[in-house]
Amino acid sequence: MYLGTQFAARTDSDYETFKQLGVNNINGFPETPHQNWTVENLIQYREKVESYDLKLDMVQLPLSSKDIDSRVKSGEFYNILTGISPERDYEIERICKIIEMCSKAGIPAVKYNLNIIGIPRTESESGRGGAKLSTFRWDKADHDAKDTYAGKVSEDVFWERIDYFLEKVVPVAEENKVRLACHPHDPYTPPGYKGVTRVLGTVEGLKKFISIQENDYHGLNFCQGTVTEMMDNPGEEIFDVIRYFGNKDKIFNVHFRNIKGSKLSFTEVFPDEGSINMYEAIKVYKEVGYKYMLSLIHI
């Protein structure tokens, strides 16, 4: 277990800063658009990271946390979650190709999201030292917000689309020995919000997710902050959830984030002031033998 970052380097000097701050491992973002990724330019990117005495632990697949409407405009993959064929089959084929290229380029893991409505938040609130805190208050959210490009997506439909994706992608990951780390839905929202029932927004949903296409290379980008946002009493509940997924070796990356509050009403805060005892959390990650990055994010 070690500290890492997923902060996207703005210039080459940021890589130097990472090293100066004691960060040795990163989740990277190749500089070439994903449509143009090749084994050669992925190797070049990894070697560039390594030239700063850093290790490239994983890269982000073109399945981000952005809402699907934004991805439609930007050209990022979205049909995997609309279920439209043959377009989704092309996207899945490209994801499989990227996994193969990462393996050949010496990149051991990838992270991704299966997100339709993005990361809902309400108005920011002020925190320590005047910091603006990312906030979600369900009682202040627009409960009548319109559906996304994806339209109505029920629980059963969402699971069907996830299963379709995993059935094709997980065997490729296993064959190429590349870990797939999926981020939960941030935050939990009541069923039908913006037309979607978010199946990866509960602990039970995450348990079901890892049981689909059970495989050593199929697991979670375990965002501790997001998981605590699913809980009524996160300060007590989170540790057993870490144990559950950690003992199954399903945690491939940790977003080491804290919140103040609980399900449907919280702010993201500095690590030392939230509802979770972060020192105790680290001890649990050690207890279960977690061996990858702890990334401080959203601060």
Task: For the regions a language model picked out, list residue spans one by one.
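Conserved small/polar residues in nucleotide/adenosyl-binding loops
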Residues: 297-299
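Conserved, mostly hydrophobic/aromatic
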Residues: 18, 26, 102, 183, ...
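Active-site-proximal loop/turn and secondary-structure-junction residues that shape catalytic pockets
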Residues: 9-11, 32, 62-65, 114-118, ...
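Short, acidic/polar
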Residues: 8-19, 92-99, 237-244, 278
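Non-cysteine beta-strand/loop elements that form the S-adenosyl-L-methionine
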Residues: 59-61, 112, 182, 248-259
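Active-site acidic/histidine proton-transfer and metal-coordination neighborhood
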Residues: 78-219
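Acidic (Asp/Glu)-rich catalytic clusters
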Residues: 15-22, 39-63, 103-104, 171-175, ...
